[in-house]
């Protein structure tokens, strides 16, 4: 996994599987063409890229995200009043539940799932709260030829219903809490995506199922789907597919939702944390 830089930015891989930290760039300032091209290529190469010691306004974060495409206003999770594209993910000290716990790809229940998520850290705990990532291209490559052949052409059904109707989720609807949900018909939708997709830029194949939002296979019953899905959920999050990002104040992290799963660790109950997420709209997966 190697990327040839066109500009003066530095790239340090986080693991053999995926992930890199990028230095030599101030995201509060307009990016030069060569800098942005390097960042785009690094995202495609490493799947998740982090930037340290950034001092960003909300508008800075939006401006950076807009370089990658149009921005999402989430149909369920309420955005900030002044910046509806930004979700403020605030977890006060003493709060047991956390947002984004469990392996998933953001918004795989959309007909056109998110291209990427961009998260900026304002307040972080002194320890804990790391985010894990898993490379779904490598997960596909590690499968036997026999199961690859079986998965070709298989369609998975994705749904937000289980995740957004759990007891902890129901408390967030129309609430004044740190994270609040809107009521949306999208929760009732069942969306089809191929189990094996191709990255629209690199053309590499990747697995596209996740334990949070993948419900069953098309033309299979839930019971029939369960054994294969359980295998895939375990396989796609194996340790050798992972990297780990430790948050610091001023960190910004972007990941490619099409070929990377992530999971937030909820191991900092006694501390505050505030992150801001912007999500770039994607296209239909094939």
Located regions from the model:
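Non-heme Fe(II) oxygenase catalytic core, chiefly the N-lobe of the double-stranded beta-helix
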Residues: 2-252, 258-286
